[in-house]
Amino acid sequence: EKMVDTTDEWITTRTGIKERRILRTPGKATSDMGLEVVRQLLEKTGTKPEEIDLLICATVTPDTTFPDTANTILDKAGAKNAFGFDINAACSGFLFALTTGSKFIESGMYKKVIVIGADKMSAIVDYSDRSTCIIFGDGAGGVLLEPNTEGNGVIDAILKSDGSGREFLHMKAGGSLKPATPETVANKEHFVFQDGKPVFKAAVTGMVTTVNQVLARNNMTTEDIDWLVPHQANMRIINSV
């Protein structure tokens, strides 16, 4: 069934995206995808749930406004000795969470920290809006952070925020500024709104600037880099960077 006026060729040419995964199981939410990540991490590393000290979940699609999705994941995973919290930073969320988690390890405060990025974007995407529905899908991933004596880890991080661009990518209603009403729901104001051109420009400029800054701060050049792993919302953004 065709939902918007587009084709696979049009989408692929402009975004590089071939498919989007959607969580369709009734009653399943972001925490369920996060739980699967935790289970796989614990199994892969031979770690018991009660050994986890902290779980950080980067998400803009929490199961509910509160409690934190991280705490729901911990409960479902049986990690009774851990505490958790969410980070809401959208596309930058996993990097923010990874840097935060690494600092808890480096400080010596905790030994085992799980960092998850998880979103059920299908819950907040308008599938009649071509500017957003062709981009977003559902998914989750994560890492288990532990101390090591080999000098490996997060070498450096530069994190930035620019709230002045919020008018170009946001949700119009549903928060404390404009609580949900029958009118806001009817007007589809609880879905993602995006103005693509300024978002594209900001993404390219921001990534290039930050990459150059972190290289310069560590006395490195692009010739020293084997891999650049960017945010993957759009192939044209990646190619421009």
Where do the PLM segments sit?
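Short acidic capping loops at alpha-helix termini that bridge into adjacent secondary structure
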Residues: 9, 48-54, 81-83, 111-113, ...
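Phosphate/pyrophosphate-binding loops at sites that engage ATP/ADP/AMP, CoA/4′-phosphopantetheine
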Residues: 37-53, 209-226
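Acidic, glycine-rich active-site loops and adjacent beta-strand->loop/helix elements
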Residues: 58-63, 89-92, 117-122, 160-162
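Flexible, glycine-rich active-site loops centered on histidine and acidic residues
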Residues: 106-140
